[in-house]
């Protein structure tokens, strides 16, 4: 009977450890995805902030060549 209790406790302990590891990996994956989304948004903002100067440069180039 004691052998069964020890085996059961061992199985439960190993199950909890593996569950904890899986949750940690899931959390890290979600953080990486959030970081990637934030990077994409910041790149988009940088591009959009440069857009007016690019347009004005293109307009002045057309005026010079036109």
Swiss-Prot record:
GO cellular component: extracellular region
Modified residues annotated as Leucine amide in this record: 65
Subcellular location field: Secreted
Signal sequence, start to end: 1-22
Propeptide boundaries: 23-44
Tissue specificity comment: Expressed by the skin glands.
Region (Disordered) residue spans: 25-44
Alphabetical keyword list: Amidation, Amphibian defense peptide, Antimicrobial, Cleavage on pair of basic residues, Secreted, Signal
Acidic residues composition-biased segments: 30-41
GO biological process: defense response
Major site of localization recorded for this protein: secreted
Keyword Acyltransferase annotated: no
Its job: Has antimicrobial activity.
Family: Belongs to the frog skin active peptide (FSAP) family. Phylloseptin subfamily.
Name the record gives this protein: Phylloseptin-H7
Gene field: psn-9
């Amino acid at each position: 009977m004691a052998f069964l209790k020890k085996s059961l406790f061992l199985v439960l302990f190993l199950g909890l450890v593996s569950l904890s590891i899986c949750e940690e990996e899931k959390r890290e994956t979600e953080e990486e995805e959030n970081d990637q989304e934030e990077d994409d948004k910041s790149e988009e903002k940088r591009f959009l902030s440069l857009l007016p100067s690019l347009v004005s440069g293109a307009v002045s180039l057309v005026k010079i060549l036109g």
